């Protein structure tokens, strides 16, 4: 089957070549010597996850398209016309510049599927209104240099491209033929490396009683029940002693980046160490990144039988109290050193990964929405008009994300959103995964 084509467009110095090399199957992008291709337009075979495509890098355009050199316009125009999808790149550090606005207009007139890719976002990034003014309905923040955000970019690319059979197959069965990336995270000395060694029946990872033996993230390719799995052992996350507990201050940035690229995160808890705020910070970070999560309490064999029931009751209470936004997180109690219940952890990961990839038809969504909103109406506003959520559709998976159309979305309270999300979990059997709602105002506020 002919590969689909993705074209990178943007002004100079926004990181097109860096992303081009990052996505290239080869470590260094090689220009294809194709007939009729000049040296100004570079081609390479690209890959994200299991999806392969042809990638085009275009010359940087930094002037008004009406006065640009004819050759640059010609090269970029040809690359746009060839494309099945355009990644329009801007620099997240410098923000939106006049050239970005001019170029976005130049690109949009071709009516090609497009994603706004905000590069150089090494830290958490919020899109302000200037980015929306560029006119793209899909926006992703990445760091091409560090490789962060590529899973989100992959999701948007799959959502935007025409649904070829090969892509449909990957979405319908997200595990077979794909690589499930499982990050094992937690505080130091919780037993992460011991757990992975027990799974693969091999002393691949150095273990011991000293906290912090693992100094960097280590990847292991593995097969489980005919599924290709990449297990990633991470350095234990601990707070810097001189800083507050805020999530941004967590040390071990390599571990934080591994979580960004994970499909599922196993949060390992030491049964002999009380549940701490740091554990909850890690779990909250996983949820904030939109990843699926499984909580594993290790060293369960060392807890007295007479204390286990009370331990579990208190543990579930703490998780449900501090992580109400993801009700139903799988929690398993294991002994890694004795290989007790360890396969149950992988089974839970496979199950929640499928939920994380769940796609619901628009008709079923709106049938549920009508019933749920009628059962619990939003209050009347001034003038006697009632706020209503009229329609919804699923815009992406990983995590399940939904766009809801309302006559007055700013009046929808957080408590009402929680009501909808919790109801959706039950109705569509979606425990333990982040569910995201995006509210959009309908053009006519009176309907």
From Swiss-Prot:
SUPFAM superfamilies: P-loop containing nucleoside triphosphate hydrolases. Gene3D superfamilies: 3.30.300.20, P-loop containing nucleotide triphosphate hydrolases (3.40.50.300). CDD domains: EngA1, EngA2. GTP 1 binds at residues 10-17, 57-61, 119-122. Residues 358-443 form the KH-like domain. GTP 2 binds at residues 186-193, 233-237, 298-301. One of its GO terms (biological process) is ribosome biogenesis. Residues 4-165, 180-357 form the EngA-type G domain. Keywords: GTP-binding, Nucleotide-binding, Repeat, Ribosome biogenesis. It holds the Pfam family MMR_HSR1. Associates with the 50S ribosomal subunit. GTPase that plays an essential role in the late steps of ribosome biogenesis. HAMAP family: GTPase_Der (MF_00195). Belongs to the TRAFAC class TrmE-Era-EngA-EngB-Septin-like GTPase superfamily. EngA (Der) GTPase family. NCBIfam families: GTPase_EngA (TIGR03594), small_GTP (TIGR00231). This is GTPase Der. The lineage of its organism: Bacteria, Pseudomonadati, Pseudomonadota, Alphaproteobacteria, Rickettsiales. The gene is der.
């Amino acid at each position: 089957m002919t590969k689909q084509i993705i074209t990178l467009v943007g002004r100079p110095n926004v990181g097109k070549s860096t992303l081009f090399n990052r996505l290239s199957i080869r470590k260094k992008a090689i220009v294809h010597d194709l007939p009729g291709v000049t040296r100004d337009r570079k081609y390479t075979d690209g890959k994200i996850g299991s999806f392969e495509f042809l990638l085009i890098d275009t010359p940087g355009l930094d002037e008004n398209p009406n006065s640009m050199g004819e050759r640059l316009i010609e090269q970029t125009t040809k690359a746009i016309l060839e494309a099945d999808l355009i990644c329009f790149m801007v620099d997240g550090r410098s923000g939106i510049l006049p050239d970005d606005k001019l170029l976005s207009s130049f690109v949009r007139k071709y009516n090609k599927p497009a994603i706004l890719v905000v590069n150089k976002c090494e830290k958490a990034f919020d899109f302000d209104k200037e980015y929306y003014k560029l006119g793209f309905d899909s926006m992703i923040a990445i760091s091409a240099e560090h490789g962060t955000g590529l899973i989100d970019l992959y999701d948007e690319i799959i959502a935007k491209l025409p649904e070829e059979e090969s892509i449909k197959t990957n979405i319908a069965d997200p595990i077979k033929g794909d690589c499930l990336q499982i990050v094992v995270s937690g505080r130091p000395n919780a037993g992460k490396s011991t757990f992975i060694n027990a799974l693969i029946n091999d002393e691949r990872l150095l273990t011991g009683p000293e906290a912090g033996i693992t100094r960097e993230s280590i990847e292991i390719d593995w097969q489980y029940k005919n599924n290709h799995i990449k297990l990633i052992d991470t350095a234990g996350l601990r707070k810097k002693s001189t800083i507050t507990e805020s999530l941004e201050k967590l040390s071990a940035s390599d571990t934080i980046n591994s979580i960004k690229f994970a499909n599922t995160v196993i949060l390992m808890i030491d049964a002999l160490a009380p549940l701490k705020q740091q554990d909850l910070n890690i779990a909250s970070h996983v949820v904030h990144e939109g990843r699926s999560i499984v909580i594993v309490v290790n060293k369960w064999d060392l807890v007295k039988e007479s204390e286990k029931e009370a331990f579990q009751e208190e543990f579930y209470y703490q998780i449900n109290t501090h992580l109400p936004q993801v009700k139903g997180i799988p929690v398993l109690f294991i002994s890694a050193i004795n290989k007790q219940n360890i396969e149950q952890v992988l089974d839970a990961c496979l199950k929640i990964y499928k939920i994380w990839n769940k796609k619901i038809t628009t008709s079923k969504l709106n049938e549920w929405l009508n019933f749920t909103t009628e059962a619990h109406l939003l209050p009347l506003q001034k003038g006697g008009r009632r706020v209503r959520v009229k329609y919804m559709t699923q815009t992406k998976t990983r995590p399940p994300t939904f766009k809801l159309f309302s006559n007055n979305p700013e009046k929808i309270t957080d408590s009402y959103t929680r009501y909808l999300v919790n109801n959706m979990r039950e109705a569509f059997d979606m425990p333990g995964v982040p569910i995201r709602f995006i509210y959009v105002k309908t053009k006519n506020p009176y309907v």
